[in-house]
Amino acid sequence: MKTGNQFNTVALVGRSNTPGIAEPLATLAGCIAKLGFDVVFEADTAREIGISGYPALTPAEIGARADVAVVLGGDGTMLGIGRQLAPYKTPLIGINHGRLGFITDIAAADMQALVPVILSGKFEREERSLLEARIVRNGEPIYHALAFNDVVVNRSGFSGMVELRASVDGRYMYNQRSDGLIVATPTGSTAYALSSAGPILHPQLQGVVLVPIAPHALSNRPIVLPDDSKIAIQIVAGRDVNVNFDMQSFTALELNDTIEVRRSKHTVPFLHPIGYSYYATLRKKLHWNEHASNEDDKAS
């Protein structure tokens, strides 16, 4: 049950098909339950780790019943559950049990110390934006999806370049020949967009970035757009073209299909430990200051 801003029910979500994750999840569940919170598990997580004694709920049921979700996994786990819980405004606490951990900012070794503090009400809250996209074919929408990181239109690994026609707010911008085009949120600017030479956007920046993938013309550069922009990308030429959403779901495209992308009305609340710094995350994950003095240790 949800009661104002107080946390009563805590949902636990784990990374799928991950050896060794059952023990830390069970430990965390016991720790949280001892503090007097009701603990529930995401159903797939409960089934995979074989835990009993806690209710097992679908993401929709978690959204309706839980006050906060604690996610133990990598960024992909956080992206997946974040999209599903976004309509319910369920806050997320991310514990890194993956490789990179840009958005799962609590180390697994620190979870028993930090999660209870956050659940007691001591945290820094941050809202992250989402994209919503639909595919239009012959004037009719055929597919709809949310994206936390990015919407990516690209060729398959065995086809040549594609030609895409991009417009913003109904105004023609360009035709582009490339391997594809990324539409990324600020959160997604440190994902695929970054590897394609896109800029890093601070998560609180109100913007969306378009990043070409291996463009034929070097003058096709990334561009940051206002976050209320309505972006349309039409398939002009090419074969075996796909669109994917956070690299977790995709659909095949045909010539003249249009992908319409805009900011979603939903946001995803993140709860960070007190003292959280996005810049510290960048330093650590991108290996900035590796040859600096102890200045990095002093920074916060």
UniProtKB/Swiss-Prot annotation:
Active site annotation, chain numbering: 75
One GO location term (cellular component): cytoplasm
Entry-linked Pfam families: NAD_kinase, NAD_kinase_C
Keywords: ATP-binding, Cytoplasm, Kinase, NAD, NADP, Nucleotide-binding, Transferase
Catalytic activity: NAD(+) + ATP = ADP + NADP(+) + H(+)
Disulphides: none
Main subcellular localisation: cytoplasm
EC class of the enzyme, as a word: transferase
Function statement: Involved in the regulation of the intracellular balance of NAD and NADP, and is a key enzyme in the biosynthesis of NADP. Catalyzes specifically the phosphorylation on 2'-hydroxyl of the adenosine moiety of NAD to yield NADP.
Protein name from the UniProt record: NAD kinase
Species per Swiss-Prot/TrEMBL record: Burkholderia vietnamiensis (strain G4 / LMG 22486) (Burkholderia cepacia (strain R1808))
Gene name tied to this protein: nadK
